Amino acid sequence: PEQCNTGSELRKIADSVCRFCYSMRLCNFRKNVKLSYRRNTELLISALDDMGYPRVAEIMSFIVCKKKQTMGITKVRIKDGGDAVSELEFFMWVEVARRCREQKFWCPTKEYGWLRSMLRKVKDIPPNIIFRVSSPKVNQLPMKEFKYRSVVYTQDRYDDVIDTESTKKCRAKYQGNACLECDYCYDPKIYTVVYPPNRIKE
């Protein structure tokens, strides 16, 4: 998360959704987590640059498909902290999704420029991967430029949202910070996911 291209700038803005980044708080609380994030990011950047995204996708898809076979994992959240390291990473995950058709992929991102560029170049995005674009500020409307979006609302505004066929509220915060059986973020029929506030004050 400390190496996020867009997020590192958004953290400086008072009303941005990255202001109280949970991954950064975890990194500050546990040094080993910070070192792990940093190492993994550097390894990914190096692999994409040195081997190219097709080869990295081949390796990653082997790992991901193996997880399904051995652990029954059918849903893959891309990035539990941080964001894409480059446009190449988006290309890589598209290829992984093509190779792992029986699994669903969800990639939350604020790397608007890289994603926009990739989407212009790749016309056949596999149906089992969702690149869900987060609006940068709290209470900002969904970014309609992108098909799949997410927003973070203050509690009062979140409470006023009514679920529709294409807009759903995330309820993980109220069920032990766990998705449980919910897969709204992975569902191509859900265009907008609304999150409650992560933290309101410093």
Language model region names:
Residues 1-202:
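Class I S-adenosyl-L-methionine
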